[in-house]
């Protein structure tokens, strides 16, 4: 009887231990309330410990140092284009791979301290992307307001909350209004109602899922070789999704191209064998 009870207790303890180990630790661009945090929740559900960092580079550095299992960072926006920080960190950290992607519909709102009126606003805080996405609305409705760039849309909301002054506002999410005790002074101020942002889920494990629908890699080389690379991709039925470039900072016309396309790890291997570029595999993954 004792041995049976001991066995049951052992199984329960192992189950608890396994459950605790299975829960991922995930870094993201913070503070609390950012769209990056929302992307974490979409990808991992509520099963995870989410750690906010003040910049994309610090979120990724925590992954590199082994302080977390994954990092979730913004990649590209419909209106603002590439989030260049993400390109730079992937170029810099060769040990980092793309394990997944999340696509979110982004609704930007003008948040202010409770009781504030639009005529009160003298300064607006937001991330560079939030400012770009809401620029037309700002120019039309509060053209004289000072616009100040901060590290994230949530950081802007946090600053307004701390100042407790009706002359300040932030371009941020509806979730941040709740988190930081603010009111939505104007909803949906983005330039495009179909405004979306892609987020990458990064890890230190090299993914090579043959069933995945997307593929990402970095091509390093001269700009005049790019047409040949695109032609080779087309021949292998790899449809280009997005391409972002950064200079190598060696000679004019030499770039890093971060490319996302349809295809699998096998597609990448075939492409890498016949390319004039130095190719670096980032991952095969699906989009959520």
Region locations from a protein language model:
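Bacterial N-terminal signal peptides that target proteins for export
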Residues: 1-8
